[in-house]
Amino acid sequence: MKQLNILLVALLGLTAVSAQASVANAEKLIMIYTTQAKAANPEYTGPTVADGKFFFNRKIKLGNGKEMACASCHTANPADNGKHVATRKVIQPLSPAVNAKRFADFEKVEAKFTQHCTDIIGSDCTPAEKASYITYVLTEKTPSAKK
């Protein structure tokens, strides 16, 4: 029994370290996107939670007349599981505090931004939008069921 408790403590510790690493990766992505945004616009002052939250919840009218937002699939709380509006497939939380795999791979993050921004907005998101989006997602650490 004592060995099981030690194993559980070790596993919980690894999960915490993994979540911290994912948050650190997200922060690195924010720095990369902020640098890109400043290169494109020297007057850019940096990402904000307010801009990220607005971008995340902003409804955009699609060609079929329906409105979509990031929150349409990812829910209003990025720490919650989402559900794809078309396939109904469960989407793991965006918040790296809850989902240690989120923001772990820069190429995957960039590919998802390109795919989803093009599908919804009609073009890739700007580096400033990406930086603010991730900044906002980092603030949501608690799933709704636990609030």
Report each predicted region and the residues it spans.
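Short glycine/proline- and charge-enriched loop/turn segments
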Residues: Q92-L94
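Local sequence-structure signature of Cys/Sec-based thiol-disulfide redox active-site neighborhoods
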Residues: K53-M68
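Short cysteine/histidine-rich zinc-coordinating motifs and their immediately flanking basic loops
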Residues: G82-K89
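The canonical Cys-X-X-Cys-His
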Residues: E67-N77, Y133
